[in-house]
Amino acid sequence: MLCRAACSTSRKLVPALGSLGSRQKHSLPDLQYDYGALEPYINAQIMQLHHSKHHAAYVNNLNVTEEKYQEALAKGDVTAQIALQPALKFNGGGHINHTIFWTNLSPNGGGEPKGKLLDAIKRDFGSFDKFKEKLTAVSAGVQGSGWGWLGFNKDQGRLQIVACPNQDPLQGTTGLIPLLGIDVWEHAYYLQYKNVRPDYLKAIWNVINWENVSERYMACKK
């Protein structure tokens, strides 16, 4: 199911605005590992706060915003609908991004990808090390809060690395299909790495779930 769903994460989590009247409420996804499972690279306190507080807040605020949007839609209040767009983008993006992020991590992660994903990385970036350096640099260079992404350009059939500010969702803002996201909001690392974002970015490669990233890539190739 993951393979079929990987390319449509954004579309499933944030329905078309016109269909909000019959929507189901969003819920916080369970993690497939314990909060302490990613130590020593990401400690349990960060994981617990990040998942149960920060991600949960995006989910709750998204549901509240969609309820308000539904009311505005029913009333034909276009002004209110427009005013709610930033909150839909921010909280919807936060939910989409984190739902992908948790699956991109694994206590059994690290190393290098295999098979067709590795071949594509070498084709589009020259080598795995060059890819790793570029995604690290792009993520480190995000001003303020945001994400570094490895995405798939379906039109060109190639991998691309980009940064998105705040919680802007990759597919909704660039058209790229998200494969691997690195959260560089301070809540993702500050309690452990303080203001040294590069140390966090160096550590996170040890828990990247390449199996999940590969599944997402193969799903997008179909």
Swiss-Prot record:
Presence of the UniProt keyword Flavoprotein in the record: no
Reaction catalyzed: 2 superoxide + 2 H(+) = H2O2 + O2
Ligand binding (Mn(2+)): H50, H98, D183, H187
Residues where 3'-nitrotyrosine is found: Y58
Transit peptide interval: 1-24
Record GO terms (molecular function): manganese ion binding; superoxide dismutase activity
Cofactor binding, note field: Binds 1 Mn(2+) ion per subunit.
Post-translational modification (record): Nitrated under oxidative stress. Nitration coupled with oxidation inhibits the catalytic activity. Acetylation at Lys-122 decreases enzymatic activity. Deacetylated by SIRT3 upon exposure to ionizing radiations or after long fasting.
Top class in the EC scheme: oxidoreductase
Gene Ontology biological process: cellular response to oxidative stress; regulation of transcription by RNA polymerase II; superoxide metabolic process
Record's signal peptide: none
UniProt modified residues of type N6-succinyllysine: K68, K75, K122, K130
Sequence positions bearing N6-acetyllysine: K68, K75, K114, K122, K130, K202
Localization per record: Mitochondrion matrix
Keywords: Acetylation, Manganese, Metal-binding, Mitochondrion, Nitration, Oxidoreductase, Transit peptide, Ubl conjugation
GO cellular component: mitochondrial matrix; mitochondrion
Needed co-factor(s): Mn(2+)
Family stated for the protein in its record: Belongs to the iron/manganese superoxide dismutase family.
Function: Destroys superoxide anion radicals which are normally produced within the cells and which are toxic to biological systems.
Assembly and binders: Homotetramer.
Name of the protein: Superoxide dismutase [Mn], mitochondrial
Organism: Equus caballus
Gene: SOD2
